[in-house]
Amino acid sequence: AKRTCVDPSKGRQQAKLYADLLEQKYGRRPVIFLTNGFDTRMDDGAYPERKVAAFYSKRDLEKLFNLRSMRISLKYVQVDKQIAGRYYQEGAIKAVCQAFGEKNRRKALLVMATGSGKTRTVIALVKVLLEHGWIKNVLFLADRNSLVTQAKRSFVNLLPDLSVTNLCEEKDNYSARCVFSTYQTMMNCIDTVEDEDGKLFTVGHFDLIICDEAHRSIYNKYRDIFTYFD
């Protein structure tokens, strides 16, 4: 932590020395946060240092370390063909897994035509990432209630063991592993939904965010969602 008039990167070397010593002592490298009160940056050791909206909560950090210990390589994944059996669906899923695993990326874009099975592709991808220990909590965003309802129904049918909730309809069910919402509803929930520890939808709450449509107008209007969640 530095004063507001100081660039938080000034403390980077000092923080890394602390992290090195803690790793030597406890056998696990801690997450580094750099801040001056306005800008906050995070170095989790898995990805390049990046800007975040706030500190991770204790629960976020525990989940991060638990997932890291359970994570399996995505190099040789088996796609559930009962969910996504078309060759291009399997190819899309493997391409995303390669981007996340081998190329160490944090974002992926799938461009698929109407009727090509986008939702099934995403469901099969979620199953792969869950089975390989890469994710725990999922957020599915769409710009209309009907699309949210339709997507949730598909997830329930194809992944019946995954707990799900639709924030547009279920106002008191926030503990599900897979959350479905419109952009506007999620904007409201970020600030208003709390549990006994405070804000529920913290910066690191979701491990995977799926956008039903990724066009520029959506991003420009709801940019805050994507800059808030890490």
Locate predicted features.
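Extracellular/periplasmic ectodomains of large secreted or surface enzymes and adhesion receptors
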Residues: 171, 178-179, 217
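SF2 helicase catalytic motif II
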Residues: 197-230
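Short acidic low-complexity segments
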Residues: 164-172
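ATP-dependent helicase/translocase motor core
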Residues: 1-137, 142, 146-162, 174-178, ...
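Activation segment
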Residues: 187-190, 218
